[in-house]
Amino acid sequence: MEMHKAINSCLLMKDEVEVLIVDRHSHDETLQVAKEYEEAYPETVKVITTREDVPFLKIALEHSEGLYFKILQCFDYLDQPSLVSVIETIRDFIRIQANLDLLVTDYKYVIPQEKEKRVSYKNVFPMETIFEWHNIKAFHKHFQIDLGSVIIKTSTLKKINTDEENIFYNELTVYGTIPYIKSMYYLNVPFHCYGTRRKIHISKSNSYVDLMKSLWDLYDVYSLKSRRQRSYVIEYLSKVYVITVYLLLKSNQKEQIELLNVHLGFNDPKLYKALTKRVYGFLISSSNEKLYGMLIKVFEKVYQLEIEE
């Protein structure tokens, strides 16, 4: 069972971490396995049971007592040498009372029958120093701070609205915390190991419309003081927009694209104009499924995505 590998990968430094396992009325062995670990490691593992309609991120944060927070799905795991480096780094920052909002690491895909692939940020972030947004080099196209690469200060994560659908915890965690992240540190180790590709379902197209609107209205992008910060946010929104429109095209909902554009343009004309100037901007008025399909192929390769019915 993949869950064993995920939990075991957290226990090497069990005296310095808390492992919160959230079970939302699973119908398999999840709860039983989780309870066994809680019994074996009562000082480290805590099992939380909740209803299916309660966002797991919200309930986990309510129970979290750690200074920093990381999300790990049951089919992923943590690289062991990297775990030691991460804990030692955080311990050092706590010792010197440094204010660190976000720790970023590399991550890798370890998918059966496929070549291992590491994603590195060494050409983007300064190394061996705390830095802020203005210290970051220019972002490459398709660059994203991935959920698997982040360890966020718990108090920072608690500032955002965690009532969104569970399927969007990735976007909520990474995008939602941007206004509150001032200080960062990059650790050049492949900490998070993805054991599978991330899937995007065409049947969820309307949910992605809601996500796009939610992210768009979440905060005022132009209130962000750093130009690098604003640039990153617009690039992030561009990616979500392209995926949303592609799903609407594939599900034959072109009228929803027009309604989405009206919403975005009306609620933030300046941001909408900036979005249209991006690499994907020429697509916004075209609704050309073939062109969107080409971009999705790029995303699938860069982000290891799978588009499914």
How would you name each of these model-derived features?
Residues 252-309:
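Membrane-interface aromatic/basic loop that binds lipid-linked glycans or pyrophosphate carriers
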Residues 10, 24-25, 51:
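Conserved short acidic donor-positioning loop in nucleotide-sugar-dependent glycosyltransferases
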Residues 69:
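Short aromatic/hydrophobic "clamp" motif used to bind/position activated sugar donors
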Residues 8-17:
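Short, acidic, metal-binding catalytic loop of nucleotide-sugar glycosyltransferases
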